[in-house]
Design a protein with these regions (language model features):
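A short, glycine/Asx- and small/polar-enriched loop/turn
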Residues: 40-42, 97, 183-187
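C-terminal catalytic lobe of FAD-dependent flavoproteins
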Residues: 53-82, 151-190
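Glycine-rich phosphate/pyrophosphate-binding beta-alpha loops
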Residues: 105-112, 145, 174-181
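Fold-independent oxyanion-binding glycine-rich loops
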Residues: 3, 11, 33-35, 63-65, ...
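Structural motif
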Residues: 28-29, 43, 58-60, 99-101, ...
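FAD-site-proximal beta/loop scaffold in flavoenzymes
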Residues: 54-127
Length: 190
C-alpha cells in the first residue's frame, strides 16, 4: 500500500516502475495512490480513490519513512535550533551553537550510514581548515530487493523539475555477459 503514484518515490521512476513490474510478476500486489487508515489484527484498511478497501495478511510491515531521532539528547539545554526535520546546520554542518556540529540522522539530510561518514569527514576537514566540497547529490543509495535498485545523482524527474539539460543513457543487463551467465538479465543501468 503506497500513498504516492509509484513505489519507491524517491528513486528514478523508470527503474522503480520496472522493479515494481518484476515484483508483480512474482506475485507481489501493489496498491498505489492508496492511504492506509487502520490495522486491525492482520487486516489493513485503506482508501483508494475514495473507496474503502481491505487486505488480509499473515504479516504486516509498516514503513513510514525516517525521522531524525533528536529526543532526549539535550538540544534545548544547550540551545541548539531544530525542528521536526532535524537539527538545523550551516553548510559546514555546524549547529546554531558555535563549535557543535550535527552529522548523520540527527540533521535530517541523508539518513544513510555512508552519508554520515562523509559528513563526519567534512566536519573534521572543516575543523582542520581544509575545504571539502560535500556533494550530497552524489551519495549513492540502494534498495535491497531482488533485483537490487541503486542510484547516485539526481533522478530524471528532479532534473526535469529543475529545468536542467541532461542526457539519458540506458543499458540492459541482457547485454551484460555476467548477467547472462547468471540468468539475471532483468536489470538495467540508466
Amino acid at each position: 500500500i503506497e500513498y504516492l503514484k509509484e513505489c519507491l518515490p524517491s528513486m528514478d521512476q523508470d527503474p522503480a516502475k520496472r522493479l515494481r513490474k518484476i515484483l508483480e510478476k512474482r506475485g507481489v500486489t501493489f496498491h498505489l495512490q492508496s492511504a492506509a487508515t487502520a490495522i486491525i489484527n492482520k487486516t489493513v484498511l485503506f482508501e483508494h480513490k475514495g473507496e474503502n478497501q481491505t487486505v488480509e495478511s499473515d504479516l504486516i510491515l509498516m514503513a513510514t519513512g525516517r525521522t531524525p531521532n533528536t529526543n532526549g539528547i539535550g538540544l534545548d539545554t544547550v540551545g541548539i535550533d531544530y525542528d521536526r526535520h532535524g537539527i538545523k546546520t550551516d553548510d559546514n554542518l555546524m549547529t546554531s551553537v558555535p563549535d557543535i556540529y550535527a552529522i548523520g540522522d540527527v540533521n535530517g539530510r541523508q539518513m544513510l550510514a555512508h552519508a554520515a561518514e562523509m559528513q563526519g569527514r567534512q566536519v573534521v576537514d572543516h575543523l582542520l581548515g581544509i575545504k571539502r566540497h560535500y556533494r550530497p547529490d552524489l551519495v549513492p543509495s540502494a534498495v535491497f530487493t531482488y533485483p537490487e535498485l541503486a542510484a547516485v545523482g539526481p533522478t530524471e524527474q528532479q532534473l526535469k523539475a529543475e529545468g536542467r539539460k541532461y542526457k539519458v543513457y540506458k543499458s540492459s543487463f541482457r547485454s551484460n555477459g555476467r548477467a547472462v551467465l547468471m540468468c539475471t538479465t532483468e536489470g538495467l543501468v540508466k
